[in-house]
């Protein structure tokens, strides 16, 4: 049974390993920097526009590393499902890559419909970032880059800046959001 499943899904399993040229340390590091920069830029704009007020809380090096690894595992699990499994299946089943790119981005958005405080804008944002992650896999041939961008995005938003991620606030973050002063803008969605 296991051999049949493994043989049928070998191309999907290979997408996670080092066989694709894009799965390398360079793209992993690029993804981490890009995820931080994308979310950090939005947070900076919201902060400069006075849509959010952040205060420094604390940094505990051991917790920082443990939480980063936890976020990496969680984000990578979503990427494995959407870009590692569904994208790869759709890519092999349809000639047009748009089917795989849009199809798994839709699933990615649907997976987040149960989030606390979900709004039309947040689902649209998640769909669009799903397109971005899919394009990375398509053009860079790198699932690792998608792992890294997703991880850095979530970590930056939730752990570094203390903003809700998927509607969830965590007890440990480097900064804290003054929720009473937060307001919707083009750079930050309070919902």
Regions found by a protein language model. Give the residues of each.
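Functionally important transmembrane alpha-helices
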Residues: 122-186
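Juxtamembrane helix-loop-helix connectors linking adjacent transmembrane helices
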Residues: 12-77, 87-88, 92
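Hydrophobic alpha-helical transmembrane segments
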Residues: 28-33, 64-65, 73-75, 98-103, 123-127, 180-191, ...
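Membrane-interface helix/loop boundary segments of multi-pass membrane proteins
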Residues: 77-103, 135-142
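Small-polar-interrupted transmembrane alpha-helices in polytopic inner-membrane proteins
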Residues: 40, 97-113, 127-130
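Membrane-interface helix caps and helix-loop-helix hairpins in membrane proteins
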Residues: 49-57, 111-120
């Amino acid at each position: 049974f296991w051999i049949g499943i493994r043989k049928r899904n070998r191309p999907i399993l290979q997408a996670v390993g080092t066989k694709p040229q894009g799965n390398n340390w360079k793209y992993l590091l690029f993804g981490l920097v890009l995820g931080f920069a994308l979310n950090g830029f939005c947070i900076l704009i919201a902060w400069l526009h006075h849509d959010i007020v952040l205060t420094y809380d604390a940094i505990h090096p051991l917790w920082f590393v443990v939480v980063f690894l936890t976020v990496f595992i969680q984000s990578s699990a979503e990427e494995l499902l959407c870009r590692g499994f569904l994208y790869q299946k759709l890519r092999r089943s349809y000639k047009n890559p748009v089917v795989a790119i849009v199809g798994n981005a839709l699933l990615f958005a649907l997976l987040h419909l149960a989030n606390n405080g979900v709004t039309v804008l947040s689902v649209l944002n998640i769909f669009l970032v799903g397109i971005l992650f899919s394009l990375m896999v398509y053009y860079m041939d790198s699932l690792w880059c998608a792992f890294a961008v997703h991880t850095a995005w979530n970590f930056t938003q939730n752990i570094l800046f203390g903003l809700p991620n998927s509607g969830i606030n965590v007890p440990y973050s480097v900064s804290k959001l003054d929720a009473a002063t937060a307001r919707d803008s083009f750079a930050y969605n309070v919902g």
